[in-house]
Amino acid sequence: MRRYPTLVVLLLLVLLPVLGCDLSMKRPIMDEIRKTGVLVVVTRNAPTTYYQGRDRVEGFEHDLATLFAAHLGVKVAFIKKQSRGEVLQTLHEGKAHLAAAGLVRQEEDGDRYLYGPDYQSVFQQVVCRRGGVRPTNLLKLTQAKLTVVKESAYEDRLRELQQLVPQLTWHSDDNLSVEQVLEQVWLGKVDCTLADSNVVALNRRYYPELTVKFPINAEQRLAWTLPKRAVFLHKEVVTWFNEIRSNGQLDELFEKYYGFVEGQSFDFVDNRQFIKRMSERLPSYKHLFMEAARKYHIPWQLLAAQAYQESHWDPKARSSTGVRGIMMLTQVTAKALGIDDRLDPKSSIHGGAWYLSNMRRRLPSTITEPDRTWIALAAYNVGLGHISDARRLAKKQNLNPNRWSDLRQVLPLLSQSKYFKDTKFGYARGDEPVRYVAKVRHYNDILTRMERKNYTGETTPFVEPNTALPMVPLKEQAVIGEINPMDGRMVETSGKEAAVPSPKRRY
C-alpha cells in the first residue's frame, strides 16, 4: 500500500509533459480577464489602427477593441508596438490577451495562434513615388531601392518571390513602421516599398505623390490574432463579431474610418493642390476658422475643409448661381444673418459656421454623431427639406434614416421622377450632397492628420518633397506589371496607374 504514493508521483512525472498544455490552462485567459477587469490588447500606432486624435485616442482597431471590452464588461488597456513582429512577440510572451493590429491571417501560423473572423480584405502593393523609378513588374523592381519593415508580412512575401527572381533584393528596417516607410518614399529617400492596400488608400491622401505600381499577391484577410490557449476568449470573439455584423456596429466603424475612401477615386491633382494650398492660403484664415470653431462648437478642421470644398479658400469666390465668399453664402442667408459683405472672410466663415451648426441643431435627436455632422453637411449643401425627403424614402426602403451610410444610398434617387414625385420637396440633384460630404470628409481627414503630425513633431507634407524629382503627367503612366499569385508568373497589361482598391469588408 505504501508503494501507491510513489507510483502516483512517478506517473505524474511521466505525464507532465503531455499534460503541460492543459496545466497551463489552469487559469484560462478569460478567468484572468474577469479577475483583473482588464482586456490587454496589443496594437500598432498607425492611421488604420490606433492613434491620438484631436481630443482622444481613435482608430479602427482601437474602437473595435474598446467595443469588445465593453461587451465583456471590462476595461481595455493598449500596448502600442510598431511592427507585426513586435506585436506577435508581445502576444507570444503573454503580455497581451489578443492582437488587434490590422494583421493578415497567416494560415502557416495556425499551430501558434488562433484567428478571429475575417473583417477586411487587402492586397500587398508595390508603392513608389510619382516621377521617380517606374518598375512595371518584378524583374524591373530589382533595379529599385526597395525598403520594407523588418520581419513583416511584406518581407515574408519578398522571400517567397526571391525564389522566382533570385536577384530581388531589399533593405529591411526595424526602426520604421510601414507608414513611416511610405513617408520615406514620398520624401524621395527610398524608391519603393510594399504596403497593404487599405494602408495605401489612406496614406496617399496625405502623400499624393505616392503611386501604386502593381500588386504582388492575392487577396489577404485581416483578423484578430490570439494565443493558441485562448480558446474561450476566441469563442467570445467569434460570437461578438457575428453580433456586430448583424446589428450594424461593424458597418458604422467602417463608415467612420473609411467612409470617405470607399467608392471614391483618388484625384492626384486635387490632392496635391489641396496640400499646396494648406501652406499658401490656409495660414491667412486659420485663426478665423479656430475662432468660429470655438463659438459654434465645430472642429476648426471641419470648417476649413468645408470652406475649401466651397471656395478653395478664395474669399472672393463667386458662382453663376449667386453664392459668394469663402463659405459661398447665398444672398438670402447673408441677409438673414445680418452680413452686409459676403466677401469679408470673417463674416463669411462665421456665417457658414452658424448655418452648419443650425442644420445640425435642427436634425431629429435620433440622429447621433458622427452621422449627425455628415447629414448636417448634406443639408448645408442640398437643403434640409430634401434631407427630410431622403429620410422618409430610406424608411420606405427599410434603411436606417439616422445613418449617413444609408442616406447616401437614397439621396441620388431624388433625381428620378418615380421617387421624387411622391416627396414633399420634389426633385433634387441628390448625388451632389453625397459627393460634397465625401470631399469635405476627405479634406477634414487630411487637415486633422497634418495637425496631429505637427503636434507630435513628425514630418508634415506642407512643402514639396524632393523638388528635384520631375513630375510625370498623368497620361504618361507606366504599364502595370502584375504577379500572377497562383504561379508567380509576371503578367503585363497596358493601362493607367494601378488602382488602389477601396478597403473591402469581408462579409
Curated annotation (Swiss-Prot):
Keywords: Cell outer membrane, Cell wall biogenesis/degradation, Lyase, Membrane, Signal. GO terms for cellular component: cell outer membrane. GO terms for biological process: cell wall macromolecule catabolic process; cell wall organization; peptidoglycan catabolic process. Its EC number is 4.2.2.n1. It is an enzyme of class 4 (lyase). It comes from the Bacteria. Residues 1-20 form the signal peptide. Its main location: membrane. Disulfide bonds: none annotated. Residues 21-261 are annotated as: Non-LT domain. Residues 264-507 are annotated as: LT domain. The keyword Signal applies. Pfam families: SBP_bac_3, SLT. It is found in: Cell outer membrane. The active site is at 310. It is a peripheral membrane protein. It catalyses: Exolytic cleavage of the (1->4)-beta-glycosidic linkage between N-acetylmuramic acid (MurNAc) and N-acetylglucosamine (GlcNAc) residues in peptidoglycan, from either the reducing or the non-reducing ends of the peptidoglycan chains, with concomitant formation of a 1,6-anhydrobond in the MurNAc residue. GO terms for molecular function: peptidoglycan lytic transglycosylase activity. The N-terminal domain does not have lytic activity and probably modulates enzymatic activity. The C-terminal domain is the catalytic active domain. Murein-degrading enzyme that degrades murein glycan strands and insoluble, high-molecular weight murein sacculi, with the concomitant formation of a 1,6-anhydromuramoyl product. Lytic transglycosylases (LTs) play an integral role in the metabolism of the peptidoglycan (PG) sacculus. Their lytic action creates space within the PG sacculus to allow for its expansion as well as for the insertion of various structures such as secretion systems and flagella. In the N-terminal section; belongs to the bacterial solute-binding protein 3 family. In the C-terminal section; belongs to the transglycosylase Slt family. PANTHER family: MEMBRANE-BOUND LYTIC MUREIN TRANSGLYCOSYLASE F (PTHR35936:SF32). This is Membrane-bound lytic murein transglycosylase F. It comes from Magnetococcus marinus (strain ATCC BAA-1437 / JCM 17883 / MC-1).
